[in-house]
Swiss-Prot record:
PROSITE patterns: COX5B_1, COX5B_2
Name the UniProt record assigns to this protein: Cytochrome c oxidase subunit 5B, mitochondrial
Reported function: Component of the cytochrome c oxidase, the last enzyme in the mitochondrial electron transport chain which drives oxidative phosphorylation. The respiratory chain contains 3 multisubunit complexes succinate dehydrogenase (complex II, CII), ubiquinol-cytochrome c oxidoreductase (cytochrome b-c1 complex, complex III, CIII) and cytochrome c oxidase (complex IV, CIV), that cooperate to transfer electrons derived from NADH and succinate to molecular oxygen, creating an electrochemical gradient over the inner membrane that drives transmembrane transport and the ATP synthase.
Residues recorded with modification N6-acetyllysine: K68, K86, K121
Pathway: Energy metabolism; oxidative phosphorylation
Membrane association type: Peripheral membrane protein
GO biological process, one term: response to peptide hormone
Organism: Rattus norvegicus (Rat)
Binding site for Zn(2+): C91, C93, C113, C116
Subcellular location: Mitochondrion inner membrane
UniProt keyword list: Acetylation, Membrane, Metal-binding, Mitochondrion, Mitochondrion inner membrane, Transit peptide, Zinc
Amino acid sequence: MASRLLRGVGALAAQALRAHGPRGVAATRSMASGGGVPTDEEQATGLEREIMIAAQRGLDPYNMLPPKAASGTKEDPNLVPSVSNKRIVGCICEEDNCTVIWFWLHQGESQRCPNCGTHYKLVPYQMVH
């Protein structure tokens, strides 16, 4: 029993000695190349990395961000991306409105919401593959 205990203590002592450098200073391991905790950019891989790089360039390749609101006039309509030549659009019309007015938006000239008159325009959108 005592020999088993001494063997365990000896193994722990050897492990502690291996952890220290040649001058008795404890060796440290870091995950990042410069030391410390890596940033999100250093750690991201795959699709997450592609999205982060695109976001740094100001792009939104997977339509994750909310659409940019325009004034909704005929000269400055709200742009609606679509992969086809028509798309169904919902307009809330007023901030405190609890119903959504749905209507079809076709490619070409800007169209108005039948209820409030806000202008929308369909723009072509290429999906990222």
